[in-house]
Design a protein with these regions (language model features):
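C-terminal substrate-binding subdomain of Rossmann-fold SDR/epimerase-dehydratase oxidoreductases
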Residues: 14, 190-298
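A glycine/serine/threonine-rich, flexible loop-to-helix segment
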Residues: 128, 179-187, 248
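A general structural signal marking secondary-structure boundaries and capping sites
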Residues: 37, 72-75, 79, 84, ...
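N-terminal Rossmann-like NAD(P)+-binding domain of SDR-like oxidoreductases, especially those catalyzing
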Residues: 1-172, 212
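Hydrophobic alpha-helix immediately C-terminal to the catalytic Tyr-X-X-X-Lys motif of short-chain
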Residues: 148, 152, 156, 186, ...
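Structural element of the ATP-grasp superfamily
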Residues: 98, 153, 186, 279-280
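Short alpha-helical
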Residues: 11, 36, 75, 177, ...
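Generic recognition of short, well-ordered alpha-helical segments
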Residues: 15, 63, 79-82, 177-181, ...
């Protein structure tokens, strides 16, 4: 299997590359190396791994491959609220460029376009769970650019016949995640003997999925040759930010006195909750939050 990965030096992308190489698949990794990228990885000199430093909105050629999987994206909500230009360039124009490059290939050489999206495209809801059939109602510039990219992908399938997959992942956590995210920030604060900052009262609910479980779902979808469909990927662990911080603290024999409450964030959605039933039925996928957390922080 030949896989072209964009954003393979990032958090989720790097775990995907690692698993693909373990399977003996060949990887070409295109990444522009942002502040959150992994600059050095154990497989840099692997015989089946090729790295190309490039911006997906600017590349003009695609190597031949079976699947093009797009992890490349700006993803920090706070940054998108302060300045959305780079989000539009990477998350919309970058996807458009990749689709155009695929469209320019002869039909026999067109790869599956596997687009990694987010559960944030749905917006928030106070109860129940979103399914893949629900309307998209993004509520901040980041999620709006991801929703726009999805519309581009669907339009290129309908107009030009380009095969696609779209996954909408919930909050991922795990090794190599940049410290701006909640769980690595908790770990950093514990290491430095600082208090963990929790925005607002910590009651905002997120769905937490271990990154390796997420990657396993992506691999299953590829191996089962599923295409032209959309899947949520979520462990369905609906926990508040405060609960997650307390859970991490327990692993280090710390108590909630190590938490401090700070000003709320702009553009904060109250609750994200999506159903993964469609994915589970299609692939047999079965994640586990607590065991994932043990693997990560234990």
């Amino acid at each position: 299997m030949k896989i072209l990965v964009t954003g393979g030096r990032g958090f989720i992308g790097s775990h995907f590359v690692e698993e693909c190489l373990a399977k003996g698949w060949s990887i070409v990794d295109v990444d522009k190396l942002t502040y959150a990228s992994n600059k050095s990885l154990p497989w840099d000199n692997h015989k089946n791994y090729t790295f190309i430093k490039a911006d997906i909105s600017e590349i003009d050629h695609l190597p031949s491959c079976d699947v093009l999987i797009n992890f490349a994206a700006e993803s920090h909500v706070d940054n998108s609220i302060k300045s959305s230009d780079v989000f539009v360039k990477s998350n919309i124009l970058g996807v458009h460029n990749l689709l155009e490059l695929i469209r320019g290939k002869p039909s026999y050489d067109r790869p599956l376009f596997f687009h990694i999206s987010t559960d944030e495209v749905y917006g928030d809801r106070h109860d129940g769970k979103f399914t893949e059939d629900d309307k998209l109602k993004p509520s901040n510039p980041y999620s709006a650019t991801k929703a726009a990219a999805e519309m581009l992908v669907l339009s290129y399938h309908r107009t030009y016949g380009i095969d696609y997959l779209i996954t909408r992942s919930s909050n991922n956590y795990g090794e190599r995640q940049f410290e701006e995210k909640l769980i690595p920030k908790c770990l950093q604060c514990i290491k430095e003997d600082k208090k963990i900052p929790i925005h607002g009262d910590g009651s905002y609910v997120r769905d937490w999925t271990y990154v390796k479980d997420n990657v396993n779902a992506l691999i299953l979808l590829i191996e089962k040759n599923i295409k032209n469909d959309v899947f949520n990927i979520a462990a369905e662990n609906y926990l508040t930010n405060l609960t997650v911080a307390k859970e991490v603290l327990t692993w280090y024999n710390k108590n909630e006195n190590c938490i401090k409450f700070v000003e709320n964030r702009w553009g904060q959605d109250i609750r994200y909750a999506v159903s993964s039933e469609k994915l589970k039925k299609a692939t047999g996928w079965n994640p586990d939050f607590i065991n994932g957390l043990k693997k990560f922080v234990g």
